[in-house]
Amino acid sequence: MPIRVFDELPAVNFLRNENVFVMTSSRASTQEIRSLKVLILNLMPKKIETENQFLRLLSNSPLQVDIQLLRIDSRESKNTPAEHLNNFYCNFEDIQHDNFDGLVVTGAPLSLVDFHDVVFWPQIDRVLHWARDHVTSTLFVCWAVQAALNILYGIPKMTRQQKLAGVYQHHLLKPHALLTRGFDETFLAPHSRNADFPTAMIRQHTDLEILAESDEAGAYLFASHDKRLAFVTGHPEYDALTLASEYHRDRENGLNPSLPVNYFLQDNPDLTPKASWRSHGHLLVANWLNYYVYQITPYDLRRMNPTLE
């Protein structure tokens, strides 16, 4: 699915260099089809890097996806130029009366921060409740999963004794589910989190269907029966070097991090790691776009008023 973005967005050249099909707005305007409108709530500090990662996964399918980037933290960014934010991001007030086919809520480095100490907690609460009536399907990733479980299901924050970092093996629980269609029976996916998602907790406190899990990482992929909500506790969008960057950053900050599991060649952080989860990440997002968004969203978004009931 070619993604449709601003002509000047830095991700255009970055992704084209990776042989990823990107369609600029000027070219897309010549095609007489309705593109899917997908809103990305980017909560990560390095916004350009995160844009590249998610746009890569959203790009590999036959229909147009019209991307809108959203920010809810008005503080000055230390990691992203103000010009970039002003040019390519909207505020919630700009889109609060619009409808979208899909919403992606990214992770955030906030797993050790109490929810009500998160500066933009009221804003994310507002966005998630707004999405009930304005978005066909929402995909939550890592910290966003923890936030959504608290806001939508009242589940308190659960924290691991030791940070989970590395590439872990997962196995399917529902191989015939639409979201896992085409998945291998076992597959690899990266994690980088302090949040804990025990399978028993999800089953006990929600009606969500757990689709895949890991012996080490717990529940990995789960979703609502109506396809309105999908949750991924890992980071299938990560680049090959993202975990390495986080590991070296934490070492430089004196945090004494553990070596990411099943990641560095020969467990040597001086060797360049390879991505072993890329095909899984592409298939997961393609399935979400197809079965959770495209197949159930109305052609005329003005007629959409979905509920979670």
Swiss-Prot record:
User: What are the site positions for Important for substrate specificity?
Assistant: 192
UniProt key word Cytoplasm = yes
User: Could you tell me where this protein is found in the cell?
Assistant: Cytoplasm
Q: Does the keyword Transmembrane apply?
A: no
The record's annotation in SUPFAM superfamilies points to: Class I glutamine amidotransferase-like
User: Which GO BP terms, alphabetically?
Assistant: L-methionine biosynthetic process from homoserine via O-succinyl-L-homoserine and cystathionine
An example Pfam family from this entry, by short name, is: HTS
The family classification in the record reads: Belongs to the MetA family.
- Give the protein name, as stated in the record: Probable acyltransferase
The scientific name of the source species is Sodalis glossinidius (strain morsitans)
